[in-house]
Amino acid sequence: MHSVHDRSDRGGALAFLGAEAAPEQASRVGHAAYVTIHGHFYQPPRENPYLDDIEPQPGAAPYENWNERILAECYRPNAFARILDERGQVVQIVNNYEYLSFNLGPTLMSWLERHDVEVYRRILAADRNSARRLDGHGNAIAQPYNHVILPLANERDRHTQIRWGIADFVKRFQRRPEGMWLPEAAIDLPTVAALVEEGIQFAILAPSQAQRCRPMGSNDSEWHEVSNSQIDPTQPYRCFLPADDPSQPQRYLDIFFYDGPVSRDMGFNDVVDSSHQLVGRLAQCLQDRGDRPQLIHCATDGETFGHHKRDKERTLAFAFAYGLPQAGLSITNYGHYLSQHPPTWEVQLKPVTAWSCAHGVGRWERDCGCASESGLHQKWRQPLRQALNWLRDRLGEVYESKVSTYLRDPWAARDAYIDVILDRTPKQIDRFLQAHRSRELRANEVVDVLRLLEMQRNSQLMFTSCGWFFEELSRPEGVQILRYAARAIELAGDAASIDLETEFLERLQQAPSNCEEYGDGAEIYRQRVLSAIVSPRRIAAHYAIKSLFSSFSREAQIYSYTVEQLDADVPHRATIGGDTLALGRLLVKSSITQESHDLIYGVLHLGGWDFHCCIQPFPGQRRYEDIQARLFGCLDHRAQAAIALQSEFGREYYTLDSLISRDRHEIMRMLTHSTLGHLNRLYRKIYQDNYRVLLAFRRDDLPVPIELQAAASMTLNQRLALLMESLERNPERGHMLQQLQQVVTEAEELGCSLQLEEATASLNRLLRQQLWHILHARELAATAQPLLQLDCYLNVVEILRAPIDVDRAQEMYLACLSQHAVAATQTGASVPLSGLLALGNRLHINVNTCLERWVQQVS
């Protein structure tokens, strides 16, 4: 945790913020000293390609998946990075993205837009603010679409990856990118040429990727060999392409080679443990070069700040706000620096290189030894690459031959398909088809076009670099790219009636796994990939089973499918005893390919976990009504009902296990609710009857019988849950504080642990609701009641010692304070403002320092 606690000055936050001395080396440098820290923020696409959604990943616990976890540990903390005073109170919140040079991969940005729009908007705003500060040059740079190793891609895919990355960037940041971060910094001459052709001005590489350099305009004898990372990173270089026409100006890409030692220290040593160390380490890189401008810059995974190294986003925040300016280092970004100081040297690159592989790009195509620290081989890498290359080429042939019937230019259409990927509304799809079709298309032909384009999208995704990066093919990253391959194969079959899976599996057999239970890539595919396939029928079964417990609107969104109820009134349902039978007709339509399926379902719930759900195409209204009559006619005999269901629909059926995991878990909790209620009543009676016995055991320091201890723990936790439910339903019940305190006291007396997860979630919701009311109050008088409620809830937090999400509360509070503080000062409304200030103290915010800084900014 970075705070002023690290320093000797104890004169208050503002006194400290101006107290840190600039490192000695930096003081020797004049105005021409600049610094750029680049963060490569990226997560691989993790969505199930059939659902367009990430399924729960237990390894990310307590979060649902790894994106959620890294969002909480890194992306959000960097958008709201704290600077703390000597008491650990917040004195300032910094948006680190306003000062970092950064790239966020398109697949990550797409996920953020859907799952945390607040952080997403902070990132976009950071780029706008940095552009205003730096003459129109924003901090954000682009990235090829899904992190494909560009030197290993064919020419067509290389350009598509860059074009999709640029289009995604333009859509989000509303400007063209100046630079592009290359996946794994992998580069070769064709990649340089592709970047130049697509209008990219610069890239960032490792110093080990340079071969030789010389002053521009020198003769061939003046080349300096720098192949052992000796290149000077404090200036940019120009990489010229071979001239096709000597009479034309040479084309070029500008290159920044980041400082290797500093970048390694940031990732693997303690240089980011405090801003003093970070600023000092950067200042050490300055050279005594007279008036020549110098750029000190480093690059590392953005996840270093908060995910790999907890709380280190605070180190950045303090360095950006105070440390670097005081050290005489001007914070800039690559585009701005390049506009002010274009290269005076040129460079030649090594033939094929990357920043994380000493063997060129071997890590992504052969068993080169990288990632072999665990003792596992990577002999699977080359066969996997070969199998996917084969599949890519076959998919390309299918695509070109089939889509040419419908579209004027298949490959131009593929490049433009990014517009649909970014906006799948019917209006955008129609706009795309209008621009690229060669003739009027029927509905089934539109579906085939979209299938073929989605086939191509998945063929891109199956080359995501993470699939090769680690030691074993059966890891989630390897399985993920095989799932994209499976989806592409399925779409090819749907659109062109071709079977590519058989030969693909034969090729995967040549990819040996390190795990005996799999043996090879083909078996991994069978066990880990085929099980993830979600057909439209499974979506219908998912809907049918869940409809027994949840009410759906006439049209519902089930992941990437729209499910429309086609029955005239409502689905037909009957219950006898504990058995329930439901039948219905659905139109299941893919939001991605627009394909639709008219299906009927029959679902029989025989109590508990016993579900039988059958699906078939709609057989016509008369046949559908006959099925209803026969099935409902035998519901009073459960064995006959189950037999009749299979007789009408066929032997294939779906069970509770067929549900998508997130919803399955929800229904499992519902099914156990009544059982838990019965157990709670039983435990409560045992506890009440034996309360004094329990106290006697505790008083005499004897081991409490586990049965009695369990009864006490269950009862107290149930009381806590009921009290929190009541408080959330009726926030006026402040008298519950005494009852909550009694629960806590009894738990302490009896040595019981209270389970606070649900209570904490409830308190977080209540706190945000009241802060929202304060934020949107038009006048200070309207904040009085929400402030009283917040005071009550914070008392509950203290009683329970609940680990609330204080960060979110602080962020909302500071927005409230900045909005109302000036108005309160002008109107003299001291009572409401005093309440607001008191709340800030309870949320560990140094309100006086925040107010003082805002007043200074206004004045």
Features from the language model and the residues they span:
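Extended, Lys/Arg-enriched charged tracts that mediate electrostatic binding to polyanionic substrates
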Residues: 78-79, 94-95, 104, 112-116, ...
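Short, well-structured secondary-structure segments
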Residues: 34-39, 43-156, 160-161, 174, ...
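Acidic, His- and aromatic-enriched active-site or binding-groove loops in soluble protein domains
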Residues: 121-139, 163, 175, 196-245, ...
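CE4/NodB-like, metal-dependent polysaccharide N-deacetylase domain
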Residues: 158-182, 245-248, 283-297
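Active-site and substrate-binding clefts of carbohydrate-active enzymes
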Residues: 12-85, 106-107, 223-265, 269-549, ...
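Beta-rich nucleic-acid/ligand-interaction surfaces
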Residues: 184-191, 210-214, 339-342
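Extended alpha-helical scaffold segments
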Residues: 698-859
